[in-house]
Amino acid sequence: MKRHLLFLGAPGAGKGTQAELLSQTNSYLHLSTGELLRKEIDMNTILGIQVKDIMNRGELVSDELVLKIVRQNLVKDNKGWILDGYPRNLSQANSLNEVLTEINQPLEVVFYLDIPEEVLIKRLLLRGRKDDTEKTIRTRVDIYKKTTEPLIQYFKDLSLLEYIDADRDLKTISSDIKQKMA
């Protein structure tokens, strides 16, 4: 069974949900970069202080700093890990591959949760978050297409990509993922 996994997909495709389910059933470490950054801030670590300062200025946390935090969590691995929503661009993917080679934990499979854009927008609007207006959702999807979609070809070229139809019920998607992990 594969133990080093990555979930890719547009905002609202179900990456976090599927990653969390899988991490619970397999005791894998679930690494979501947003949660990792918040944890560093909450723990008031040296990296957390840097991250908080950057975020307070309204700036984006650098790829280098995010990778440092991801790396320090990957080396804690004992059973397996799942990266959720990282990397977000080709530069991050190349840097991540270097780190994974260095720590001898190569990526084994990338699950791409594929979902039609209109279904995605409807799903996000139903979440009921204040910042989830149709306009902001479309903007986020456009940014995703420009920066993250090239990763699909990148991981396909590395023979790591598995397509998952994310326009189905939770159980069916989860079952499909488990089959492709074997």
UniProtKB/Swiss-Prot annotation:
Residues reported in the UniProt entry to bind AMP: 33, 38, 59-61, 85-88, 92, 129, 140
Region feature NMP, mapped onto this chain: 32-61
Coiled coil: none
Pathway named in the protein's UniProt entry: Purine metabolism; AMP biosynthesis via salvage pathway; AMP from ADP: step 1/1
Annotated GO MF terms: adenylate kinase activity; ATP binding
Annotated PROSITE patterns: ADENYLATE_KINASE (PS00113)
A Pfam family reported for this protein in Swiss-Prot or TrEMBL: ADK
Chain segments carrying region LID: 126-132
Zinc-finger among keywords: no
Binding residues annotated for ATP, in chain numbering: 12-17, 127, 168
This enzyme's EC code(s): 2.7.4.3
Annotated Gene Ontology cellular component terms: cytoplasm
GO biological process, one term: AMP salvage
Entry-linked HAMAP family: Adenylate_kinase_Adk
Comment field on protein domains: Consists of three domains, a large central CORE domain and two small peripheral domains, NMPbind and LID, which undergo movements during catalysis. The LID domain closes over the site of phosphoryl transfer upon ATP binding. Assembling and dissambling the active center during each catalytic cycle provides an effective means to prevent ATP hydrolysis.
Entry similarity comment: Belongs to the adenylate kinase family.
PANTHER family (UniProt xref): NUCLEOTIDE KINASE (PTHR23359)
Chain's role: Catalyzes the reversible transfer of the terminal phosphate group between ATP and AMP. Plays an important role in cellular energy homeostasis and in adenine nucleotide metabolism.
Name listed for the protein in its UniProt record: Adenylate kinase
Organism: Prochlorococcus marinus (strain MIT 9215)
